[in-house]
């Protein structure tokens, strides 16, 4: 069964799914372009908001192993409407609080909940687009461009008003979508109703604690001088103990939360290695920000525009991906072209970091970075 009632026209169904993607996918506890405004507005050090940014991703990861069981446990309309209302309330909380730990915790919960809505859109869109390969080419291209656009407007709204207004806007959009979903979605189950008691909540807690403590170390390490800080040492020990307990528990469960057997497959190991390499290339964003803001003197809005320059490259990568998967060609050359584009971006920027660097000179390296990311 799909998401919407039988009387809803197909174009309206597609429009609703696009609106859900536009609102839910960029949603987070913090927005990267907003961090400097949040630091100035709350008087809290930047590291808390970096930690909150990690927390959103950790929440999404924690939801992944149980997301299908959640999908089949509740009626479609009830689940999506309640989740949108909760996301709207959490966004409003972030707009009104100046307590950093509240923002960190809401970011974690927002990540968990937005993943539950996202999975509702995966299967209908995959069927509509006709194949997994084409779906990934279209879907991830759309999401990557959407993230760049939302980051830009987050900065623009923060400059014209304040950083709280973007959270209020996100909250209002969630409430409006909840009303539309209540009208257009059906109140039936996706498939056979399944119980939740097979979900191991302790494993989820251990998973979250492992990565939240690790994210704390990565976020606050430099600020607290790494191993010279008791907090960093204690967080590192807590992350290690949590991971050890998580691994031991998975070995004793009949239905483990995470199966470590997947890490014995060569495809998974190769994929993890490529993700690590991609992460290293994407890590150059921090160097790029230091150069653009600290050396060239760009303001936050101009700096956000640089990320918009990646959109044509991302779009081209998505178009190539669709044709590549449609022709069922081997992925080696496609992946190689992406890493080659990333390498070219890094080389160009290495030789271009001078005070005479013009704004127009950003177009080529950012296009290559976008293509590599896509």
What spans do the regions from the language model cover?
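Small-residue hotspots at the loop-to-helix junctions and early N-terminal turns
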Residues: 43-50, 137, 229-235, 300-308
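Helix-breaking motifs and short loop linkers at transmembrane-helix boundaries and internal kinks
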Residues: 43, 75, 93-101, 297, ...
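12-transmembrane solute porter fold
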Residues: 11-27, 31-36, 53, 68, ...
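Hydrophobic transmembrane-helix bundles of small-molecule transporters
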Residues: 160-273
């Amino acid at each position: 069964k799909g998401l919407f009632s039988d009387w809803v026209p197909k174009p309206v169904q597609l429009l609703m799914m696009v609106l859900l993607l536009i609102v839910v996918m960029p949603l987070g506890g913090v927005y990267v372009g907003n961090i400097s405004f949040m630091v100035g507005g709350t008087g809290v050090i930047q590291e808390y908001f970096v930690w909150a940014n990690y927390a959103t991703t950790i929440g999404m990861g924690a939801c992944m192993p149980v997301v299908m069981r959640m999908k089949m446990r509740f009626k479609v309309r009830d689940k999506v409407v309640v989740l949108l209302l909760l996301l709207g309330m959490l966004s409003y909380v972030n707009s009104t609080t100046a307590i950093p730990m509240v923002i960190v915790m809401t970011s974690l919960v927002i990540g968990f909940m937005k993943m539950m809505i996202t999975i509702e859109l995966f299967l209908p869109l995959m069927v509509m687009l006709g194949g997994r390969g084409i779906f990934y080419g279209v879907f991830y291209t759309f999401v990557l461009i959407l993230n760049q656009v939302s980051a830009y407007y987050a900065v623009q709204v923060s400059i014209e008003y304040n950083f709280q207004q973007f959270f209020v806007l996100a909250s209002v959009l969630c409430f409006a979508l909840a009303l539309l979903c209540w009208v257009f979605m059906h109140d039936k189950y996706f498939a056979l109703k399944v119980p939740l008691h097979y979900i191991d909540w302790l494993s989820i807690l251990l998973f979250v604690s492992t990565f939240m403590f690790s994210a704390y170390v990565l976020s606050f390490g430099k600020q607290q001088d790494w191993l010279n800080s008791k907090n960093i040492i204690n967080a590192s020990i807590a992350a290690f103990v949590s991971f050890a307990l998580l691994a031991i528990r998975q070995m004793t469960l009949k239905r483990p939360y995470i199966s470590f057997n997947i890490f014995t497959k060569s495809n998974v190991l190769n994929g993890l290695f490529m993700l690590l390499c991609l992460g290293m290339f994407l890590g150059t964003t921090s160097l790029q920000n230091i150069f653009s803001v600290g050396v060239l003197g760009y303001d936050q809005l101009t700096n956000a525009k640089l990320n918009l320059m990646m959109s044509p490259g991302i779009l081209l990568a998505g178009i190539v991906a669709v044709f590549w998967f449609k022709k069922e060609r081997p992925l080696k050359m496609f992946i190689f072209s992406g890493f080659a584009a990333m390498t070219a971006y890094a080389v160009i920027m290495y030789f271009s970091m001078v005070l005479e660097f013009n704004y127009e000179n950003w177009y080529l390296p950012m296009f290559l970075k976008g293509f590599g990311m896509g």
